[in-house]
Amino acid sequence: MPVRPARCYRRIKGPPYTREEYIHGAPMIQIPKFDMGVTSAAARAAFSMVAKLVVEERGQIRMQALEAARQMAYKYLSKYVGDANYYLRLNVVPHHVLRENRMLAMAGADRLQEGMRLAFGSPAGRAARVEPGQVIFYAEFRPEHIAHIKEALRRAASKLPLPTRIVIETKDDGGGKTFTQK
């Protein structure tokens, strides 16, 4: 069966459904990498700027959307900045298991389904639950790459179902200057 559109799962309804030991057939998390670029702390000390993609509304982001956004940002940064000139981290993990009560809509389907009887649904995917102000992507870089980082995060935001903003800061322990772009 095809994947349902994101609008079916964007809003949070009910408690999180995360206990894998009780869920038979829960899908695996299909995000292979959460840290990209320069991952060693010693090499990251040379980066003086920080960019964050921050979500503005409460909701759920499916793992397919997170992976599409990650690939979009990673490919753009690898091509235009180079893997040795940035650090990118995906901060959220899709722990919540989505359920789907599959309904068939074809001739003879009434013999195959139960309607709303036993309508709890079977596992159909995973999603990350996010709150306003939560960081989705975190990037460290040098000041000369600020335009490419902003473009990569903008492209990643286009794959997400919730409104986001890009926050750019200087990387120091005291907070520093903050620049926000919607």
UniProtKB/Swiss-Prot annotation:
Keywords: Ribonucleoprotein, Ribosomal protein
Keyword Ribonucleoprotein: yes
Annotated signal sequence range: none
Domain of life, per lineage: Archaea
Record bears the keyword Nucleus: no
Protein name: Large ribosomal subunit protein uL16
InterPro entries documented for this protein: Ribosomal_uL16 (IPR047873), Ribosomal_uL16_arc (IPR022981), Ribosomal_uL16_CS_euk_arc (IPR018255), Ribosomal_uL16_dom (IPR016180), Ribosomal_uL16_euk_arch (IPR001197), Ribosomal_uL16_sf (IPR036920)
Positions of transmembrane segments: none
Molecular-function GO terms, alphabetical: structural constituent of ribosome
Gene: rpl10e
